C-alpha cells in the first residue's frame, strides 16, 4: 500500500521541480526509504539517478535560453566530479555496515546516511524559507565588482561533490550562492548553471555506483523516474499560473518538518 503513496510522492517531487525549478529532489531519499522500502545506502544511489535525470530536463530548458555559464560549470565540476565519483566508487563501499555500538543502540552505515541526509534537509529547508531575503542580498553583491573567485568555486565544488556522493542530493542551496558570489553570475544564470552542475554531478556519481557493482533494480528505478518526469511535465505547465517563488518558503517548512522527523525517528527511536 505504501508503494502507491511512494509513486504519488514521485509525481509530487517532479511537480515541485516543475513549478519551483528546484528543491523537490531533496525528498527522493526519504520517499525511497520510508515509502518504497529501499535501504538508505541504495536509496542514495537511486536518488543520484533520479536527481541527475530530472536535472537534465531542467537544465536543458535553461540552456536553450542561454542561461547556463559553461565556463563556470567546467571550473566547478573539475573537483566536484572527481569527488563524487571517488565517494561512490571507493568511500561508500569501504564504510563498514556497523560503525559502533553503545548499549542497545547500533550506529550503522544506514543510520549515518539518514542522519547526514536529515541534517542536509534542515539546511536546505532553511535556505528555501529565507530564499527571498537571500536572493536580495546576493543581487546586492552583484553591484560590487569582483574578479572570478577560482579558489571559492573550486573549494565549494569539492565540498558539493563529496556531499552529493555521500547523501545522493544535489546541493543546489550551496551551489547557487557560490556561483553568485564567486563567479558573479546573475540569479537566473546561477540557477541554470546550478542545474547543469547537479545533473552531471549526480549522473557521474551514479556511474561510480555502477562501476562499484551496486545492484540496481532497473525496472523499479525507471518506473519511479517516469512518475517524477510526469510530475515535471505537469509542474512546468502549472508554473504558468502558479508563482513558484511564493511556494518555496512553504515547501521549505515542509522539508524542515520532514528533516526534523527523520532526525527524531532515527536518533531517538533507533536501536539497530
Task: Please report, for each region that a protein language model flagged, where it lies by residue.
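Generic transmembrane alpha-helix signature in multi-pass membrane proteins
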Residues: 29, 58-65, 163-165, 175-180, ...
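Juxtamembrane transmembrane-helix boundary motif
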Residues: 1-13, 34, 61-160, 211-272
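Membrane-embedded alpha-helical segments of transport systems
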Residues: 49-57, 78-90, 197-204
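Juxtamembrane transmembrane-helix termini in multi-pass membrane transport proteins
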Residues: 20-73
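Transmembrane alpha-helix interface/packing and boundary motifs in multi-pass membrane proteins
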Residues: 11-21, 158-167
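Interfacial segments of multi-pass membrane proteins
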Residues: 28-42, 174-189, 208
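Transmembrane alpha-helical segments that form core, pore/gating elements
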Residues: 146-183, 187
Amino acid at each position: 500500500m505504501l508503494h502507491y503513496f511512494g509513486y504519488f510522492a514521485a509525481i509530487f517531487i517532479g511537480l515541485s521541480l516543475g513549478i519551483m525549478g528546484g528543491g523537490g529532489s531533496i525528498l527522493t531519499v526519504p520517499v525511497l526509504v520510508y515509502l518504497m522500502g529501499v535501504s538508505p545506502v541504495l536509496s542514495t544511489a537511486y536518488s543520484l539517478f533520479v536527481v541527475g535525470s530530472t536535472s537534465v530536463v531542467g537544465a536543458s530548458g535553461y540552456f536553450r535560453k542561454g542561461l547556463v555559464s559553461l565556463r563556470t560549470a567546467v571550473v566547478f565540476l573539475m573537483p566536484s566530479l572527481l569527488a563524487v565519483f571517488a565517494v561512490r566508487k571507493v568511500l561508500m563501499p569501504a564504510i563498514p555496515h556497523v560503525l559502533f555500538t553503545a548499549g542497545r543502540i547500533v550506529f550503522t552505515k544506514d543510520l549515518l546516511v539518514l542522519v547526514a541526509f536529515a541534517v542536509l534537509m534542515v539546511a536546505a529547508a532553511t535556505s528555501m524559507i529565507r530564499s527571498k531575503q537571500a536572493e536580495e542580498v546576493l543581487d546586492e553583491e552583484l553591484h560590487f565588482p569582483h574578479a572570478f573567485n577560482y579558489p571559492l568555486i573550486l573549494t565549494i565544488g569539492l565540498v558539493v561533490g563529496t556531499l552529493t556522493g555521500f547523501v545522493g542530493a544535489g546541493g543546489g542551496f550551496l551551489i547557487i550562492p557560490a556561483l553568485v558570489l564567486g563567479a558573479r553570475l546573475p540569479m537566473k544564470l546561477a540557477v541554470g548553471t546550478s542545474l547543469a552542475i547537479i545533473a552531471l554531478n549526480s549522473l557521474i556519481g551514479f556511474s561510480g555506483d555502477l562501476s562499484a557493482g551496486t545492484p540496481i533494480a532497473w525496472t523499479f528505478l525507471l518506473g519511479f523516474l517516469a512518475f517524477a518526469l510526469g510530475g515535471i511535465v505537469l509542474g512546468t505547465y502549472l508554473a504558468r499560473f502558479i508563482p513558484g517563488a511564493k511556494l518555496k518558503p512553504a515547501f521549505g517548512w515542509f522539508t524542515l518538518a520532514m528533516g526534523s522527523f527523520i532526525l527524531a525517528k532515527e536518533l531517538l527511536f533507533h536501536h539497530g
